[in-house]
Amino acid sequence: MNQAMATPLSLSCCSPTLTRSTLFFTKTFPFSRSFSTPLPLSTKTLISLSPPHRTFAVRAESQNGADPARQYDFDLFTIGAGSGGVRASRFASNFGASSAVCELPFSTISSDTTGGVGGTCVIRGCVPKKLLVYASKFSHEFEESNGFGWRYDSEPKHDWSSLIANKNAELQRLTGIYKNTLKNAGVKLIEGRGKIVDAHTVDVDGKLYSAKHILVSVGGRPFIPDIPGKEYAIDSDAALDLPSKPQKIAIVGGGYIALEFAGIFNGLKSEVHVFIRQKKVLRGFDEEIRDFVAENMALRGIEFHTEESPVAITKAADGSLSLKTNKGTEEGFSHIMFATGRSPNTKDLGLESVGVKVAKDGSIEVDEYSQTSVPSIWAIGDATNRVNLTPVALMEGVALAKTLFQNEPTKPDYRAIPSAVFSQPPIGGVGLTEEQAAEQYGDIDVFTANFRPMKATLSGLPDRVFMKLIVSAETNVVLGLHMCGEDAAEIAQGFAVGIKAGLTKADFDATVGIHPTAAEEFVTMRTPTRKVRKNQASQGKSDSKAKAVAGS
């Protein structure tokens, strides 16, 4: 592996992939038990085994290192007004605590001196990215409409500057809503960079604030490997706010950020090349989903360069960029974007100087209650590199507020967290992949459907949908649900309730479908595509035969 391309484990809070290898199990058991030992499966409970965290001596229900006789400026002082920080501060205030949060001045591109209330998700992550996804999908819909009788006198044109201006206006509106939410909850918002001075003191641009508890919720930042010419590259922050649309763009990375931006720029009619170090995209996702999404993105004109690592970037006299890899050089790019992971934004916060334990990747070590090695200091969200998704940070924030100010020690619940990739076609899923399920439980039944959606029968486009259920052969509990195709995220969100509740395949079979929809396929798949057994070869095919008739 090219050492320059070593990617941090941390992902965005918007990330759909559970960090490291969060696995789903069905019975509480000691961490000392071998991970390879199959576990008995309850029909009603799915719990997750998150990456092991340090267990500290001081528990959540104690005074947590606070001096009961001391007077503090605030009960809770939060560094970072992103999704998790705002949620924790607001709930703390609702529970009767005095609360303050500090945040850097607003900017669409983050830096050591800029940030903004709302954090990555609102300003340079989930929200603006989804708006650009919407914008890019219209070109495909224009193509689809021809088969339904629509005709256009001229080719529709896209105005990039209008999109970015409208997007930025929406971000300002949302940031204002976040500020008002804090104000209405009685949370004091302080603009500036926070740094921890001691276990109960935060310095914000030279002014000191004392707090009974300090919460670190600073999120993460994009990571670009240190290669010659890296100054010519852009990251995901910049890609959301470019002054002009790329004509030809290289996207380095095979994760969800890379695929989402590949779909965005492809839909906006840029020439898109994706360079990945491995043979496949989306490491950690279900293998069939990985294959299906790459194949369908390629059909839309995206060119994948597999097993290629960047070596250098050069700039020609005409301003065009060239990307040199271990296999050769591709020239003529207007932009080169790196989507090679994110790192916890914990540098220069004063953590180590006050005794907070920080991992090699910069993530803050916490226990099950989000408490650090310093009893009065806590951390949530991407800064801890647990499960880096916005809804998870929100959950962690509420759990923390309950633990500290509601006399209700609460651990975040990482069971059956659904996730999505807003690629084109999009991906949605919840629970175990087939590979994880086979490793943990041995005997599983796999149900798949690969079909042409109804809309494609008239559009004439090569769009397809892939859907998959993974079921325990022993108990009939549905362990995982995965989909790639239109509305996958929306469909997966609904089924996530059932997966977390521990529903069985029989429960799915007993549910009446809504016709005609793609979602009904999840409750009409009756025959396993294959049966995977621990002590014998798999029975069946690696993929289902394509169904030529939509709605079947």
Curated annotation (Swiss-Prot):
List of residues binding glutathione: S83, Y178
Superkingdom of the organism of origin: Eukaryota
Subcellular location: Plastid, Chloroplast; Mitochondrion
Transit peptide start and end: 1-60
EC number: 1.8.1.7
Catalyzed reaction equations: 2 glutathione + NADP(+) = glutathione disulfide + NADPH + H(+)
Disulfide-linked positions: C121-C126
Functional description taken from the UniProt entry: Catalyzes the reduction of glutathione disulfide (GSSG) to reduced glutathione (GSH). Maintains high levels of GSH in the chloroplast.
Name of the protein: Glutathione reductase, chloroplastic/mitochondrial
